[in-house]
Amino acid sequence: MEYVYAALILNESDEEVNEENITAVLEAAGVDVEESRVKALVAALEDVDIEEAIETAAAAPAPAAGGSAGGEVEAADDDDEEDAEEEAADEGGDDDGDDDEEADGEGLGALFG
């Protein structure tokens, strides 16, 4: 991440984003510089307009909070059905003659609906 930040600093200060300048920024920040990562970053940013990329990223709409995709809701419904089937199976085989709901954990159903 610090490599990208170095490129952003260079862009903001109107310096050329090249291997030498990125290495200088990283060394000034005390980062152990890997030349292969510097070369890869410079190659990746060669045809990129950084200002345009920043504006595009800043203008992108934020995802709606609390919303979920329809597929996720359906999967949750399937899980609820499976849980209900498991509970029904558990109720039939757990009849030890003890009507103490607390001991069986059945009293918790009222708390969680």
UniProtKB/Swiss-Prot annotation:
InterPro entries: P1/P2_N_sf, Ribosomal_P1/P2, Ribosomal_P1_arc. Residues 56-66 have a biased composition (Low complexity). Disulfide bonds: none annotated. The keyword Nuclease does not apply. It holds the Pfam family Ribosomal_60s. Belongs to the eukaryotic ribosomal protein P1/P2 family. Forms part of the ribosomal stalk, playing a central role in the interaction of the ribosome with GTP-bound translation factors. Part of the 50S ribosomal subunit. Homodimer, it forms part of the ribosomal stalk which helps the ribosome interact with GTP-bound translation factors. Forms a heptameric uL10/P0(P1)2(P1)2(P1)2 complex, where uL10/P0 forms an elongated spine to which the P1 dimers bind in a sequential fashion. This is Large ribosomal subunit protein P1. It comes from Haloferax volcanii (strain ATCC 29605 / DSM 3757 / JCM 8879 / NBRC 14742 / NCIMB 2012 / VKM B-1768 / DS2).
